[in-house]
C-alpha cells in the first residue's frame, strides 16, 4: 500500500506540470456573426448591440476570435478598442469585458462620441504574441 502512494503522487505532479490544453474557439458561432475579418490564420467575428451604432450612444460588441488557422484554437486574450485616425484620438470611455467562453467575449460601454470615420481594433493574443485586425466604420448622425 505504501508503494502506491509515491507512484500516485508522482502521477499527480506530472499531470499538474503538463501544459494546459488550449480550448477550441466556438466556430459554430463564428459563422453566425454578421461581420468578420481574417488574416494570417487569425479570424475575428463580431456583432454590435444595437446593430446600428448611433453617435454618442453606448453600445456593446460581442467578439469571437480564433487563432492557429486550421486548428481553430481560442486565443489567450482578446481586446477591443476604437479610434478616429483622422482626428488622432480614441474613445472617451474604456469598455469592460465579460468573457462568455474561450475566444468569446462581450465588451460593454463602447461609445463613438462623434460622427465620422472610426477604426475598430481587435487585438488577439496567443500567449504574449499579439495579432491586430482592424475594420473601418463610418458613423453618421
Predicted regions: what they are:
Residues 17-19:
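N-terminal signal peptide c-region/cleavage motif recognized by signal peptidases
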Amino acid at each position: 500500500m505504501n508503494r502506491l502512494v509515491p507512484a500516485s503522487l508522482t502521477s499527480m505532479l506530472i499531470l499538474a506540470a503538463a501544459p494546459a490544453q488550449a480550448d477550441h474557439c466556438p466556430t459554430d458561432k463564428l459563422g453566425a456573426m454578421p461581420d468578420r475579418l481574417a488574416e494570417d490564420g487569425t479570424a475575428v467575428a463580431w456583432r454590435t448591440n444595437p446593430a446600428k451604432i448611433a453617435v454618442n450612444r453606448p453600445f456593446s460588441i460581442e467578439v469571437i476570435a480564433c487563432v492557429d488557422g486550421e486548428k481553430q484554437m481560442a486565443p489567450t486574450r482578446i481586446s477591443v478598442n476604437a479610434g478616429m485616425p483622422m482626428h488622432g484620438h480614441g474613445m472617451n470611455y474604456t469598455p469592460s469585458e465579460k468573457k462568455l467562453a474561450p475566444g468569446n467575449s462581450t465588451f460593454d460601454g463602447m461609445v463613438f462620441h462623434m460622427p465620422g470615420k472610426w477604426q475598430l481594433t481587435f487585438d488577439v493574443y496567443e500567449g504574449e504574441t499579439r495579432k491586430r485586425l482592424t475594420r473601418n466604420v463610418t458613423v453618421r448622425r
